[in-house]
């Protein structure tokens, strides 16, 4: 969907509503799909509400793939990440889920109490952290704290969080606010979604969007700052 042109259906001083219509068969997926995204800012909180309908059963597991750079300094080494996940989906050598759900205890994926990120190839993160077995009411699930003291608290209704370290970022064609393109390990991505791989593993949460049962996701990012030093 990131390569599609969305329409602005509505907008105001603190919000925008985007819509997208995907015809049956586009991308190899069945169903005419109507998707709506609402982004709204209230004080220091950005909230995304995603809804979708389909006139035929179809796989549907969207995720916001924003990269989060909270510092004025390059890279994200030394930033602290905390994630409320007790388990993760084991990936194989091709990064596909094996179907095994493993505890994060004594693994590189235990972020429950917070850990500093290296932000380089000494670490590797591209996997799903399990926040639960089903959707839930909006609740805090992750916190990223930058070296300059900027904090981002992420909340979501989703049952999974894909953590990606940004090791293959190639932004040569996309100049940034600073004028220089982003490269590998410029920033991590925290992607709220259902567990990837559910079509191959029946014990994973269901991601089929069915007629009469609209999809709905709420994810928010709240920012604050603390004194460093």
Locate the predicted segments by residue.
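An exposed, glycine/acidic-rich loop-and-rim segment of catalytic or binding clefts
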Residues: 1-229
